[in-house]
Each structure stands twice: as C-alpha cells, then as structure tokens.
Amino acid sequence: VQQRWNRRVFLQVAAAAGLLAACSKPKPAPGTAGGGAVTITHLFGQTVIKEPPKRVVSAGYTEQDDLLALGVVPIAVTNWFGDQPFAVWPWAQPKLGTAQPVVLNLDNGIQIDQIAGLKPDLIVAINAGLDADTYQKLSAIAPTVAQSDGDAFFEPWKDQATAIGQAVFQADQMKSLIDAVDRKFADIGQRNPQWKGKKALLMQGQLWQGTVVATMAGWRTDFLNQMGLVIADSIKPFGSDHRAVIPRDHIKAVLDSADVLIGTTESPEEQQALLAARGVAASRATAENRHIFTTKDQAGAIAFSSVLSYPVVADQLPPLIAKILG
C-alpha cells in the first residue's frame, strides 16, 4: 500500500473519528480593510493582506487548485498523494504551464524553515493542519491564511476557495468559478430526472483494517445531491462527522441498500481487492453490477473537491452513473 494513499485515508478516517475535527462554528465572511487591503478572518484571528501577492506559498494539500484557477502560480506547492509532477494534477497542469514550483510536504509537519527561505508575500495554509504555534511562526514570515474553524484539514471546498479568492484580490472571479461548478452539476440533475432520489454510496477505494469507509452526507457529497442522488441512510449508524466506518458484518446490508456505489479506486488492483472483500463479494450490489470504480485521476478529482477538479467529475462520472441508473 502506498504511503501517500495511507496518509490520505488516515486523514479522512481520522477526521471521521473526530481526531482532526472539532465542531464547526459560524464564521464571518472575509472582508476588505481600509486602503484597499483585504482582511481574512480565520481560526487564529485576522490576516490583513495589503496588496495582491506575487510570491504565494501553497502550504496545504489542495490550495494549489484554487490559486491556479485564478491564474496565481504559487512558488511552492505541497504534495498530498498521487505522485503528480510538482504536486499538480492533470486538471490543473495547464494552469501551471512551464512553472516549476518547489514541492513541499507535510510528512513531518509544515516545513517552516524552507518556506521562510522562499521569501513569500502570502502563505495559504487552509488545508495544512495548522495549530496556533505554527500559525504564529508562519505569520512571522508572511501574511498567512489559516483554516476558518476547528477542522484542521478539509474544510468545505467553497469556504476554502472563497477565502483564497479574497486573499489574492479576485473574490468576484472565484465566485463565478464556484457558481459555474454548481450550475454544471445542477444541469446534469435536470437532464437526468430518473436519478432523483436514488440512493448512492461514495466509498474509499481501499478497505480500512477490513472495514469499508464511506462518506457521510455533507459538503463532500453535495455534488451528488445536485445531480439528484441522495446518500443512503444505511451508513448513518456507523458515521462520525465526515466518514462512516462500516464493520465487516454490516458491509453486505449497507451496500445492498444503495442503487449505485462509487468506489474511489486508483487502479484495477484496488478494484479487484475491493470486490473480493468479504461482504462486498457477497452483496447483491456486486451481483447486480451496481458499482462504479474510478480511475486514479477521477479519484483524485473527487478528493481535491475544487473549482478545477469538479468539472472533471461532472464530465466523467455521469456517463458511468447512467450505465447503472439509466
């Protein structure tokens, strides 16, 4: 099992267990300060950005997509998973062009000294697991945008995108990009009324210690809701926060309750392993071919949940759903 995949699954499952997440609280919207500066309100206070930044470090797992979508090419990007060139996935690579940003990682925490050496004028660290001490150290280097509430990783994609749009003085452009994603998924739902109310499961592409991990209804499944689907209620008893961890003895019943099952696999080997798992192999869902298995790029696009990756999902997932639901 690849180390990067392990880190991806750990973060998402740990969030489900409440290890990396706290209760969300209402968050004020970013605003403008005097003299044309922008003020971003976040978990650790407020950050004032006096002018459009030119040397931006993307210090979290997914912020590069939001920056690149606005034409802001970061001087450093943080690797998450997937072994992509410069930690930028195919949907964002055209926006990167010939740039060659420094690639950071969070394997041992944020690389503060390396970031300082890059002399940034903005650090975007919304999906970086910041604590107060690390925030203070980064803020001593350059204005730093942190997560907006207690979720150390993976706050709602629209909140992250909106804050980044504000931080680079392109709030209106970001709003247009977000609205376009919403329209794209809503249009798919309107064109496929037969999908309305059908039950779906969005599952990790690998088992977690013999269990199936599925995504609870929430912002991560909004794109499915916009297309008319609903997350099957059968996962609720096994859910905590963002993720449901379904024990071996319950896998068959949970899977059988869904009309379509989307497994975010990254390889044919992962597909085969998932189908061979006890409970999955025995399910009617498997016998009746209700499974969709993603490619590596499709799994990445769902995981990144960004204004650049979601259009890939909207283009490539519906034909697969249509094979099952009509």
What do the PLM-derived regions correspond to, one by one?
Residues 23-32:
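Bacterial lipoprotein signal-peptidase II cleavage site
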Residues 55-70, 173-234:
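Basic- and aromatic-lined ligand-binding clefts that recognize polyanionic substrates
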Residues 254-326:
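Structured C-terminal subdomain patch of bacterial secreted/periplasmic proteins
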Residues 119-125, 143, 257:
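Proline-aspartate-enriched helix->loop->beta-strand connector
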Residues 1-5, 9, 13-22:
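N-terminal secretory signal peptides
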Residues 31-68, 81-83, 318-325:
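Extracytoplasmic low-complexity, Pro/Thr/Ser/Ala/Gly-rich segments
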Residues 46, 133-207, 303-326:
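Extracytoplasmic substrate-binding proteins
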Residues 63-114:
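A short, structured surface patch at a secondary-structure boundary
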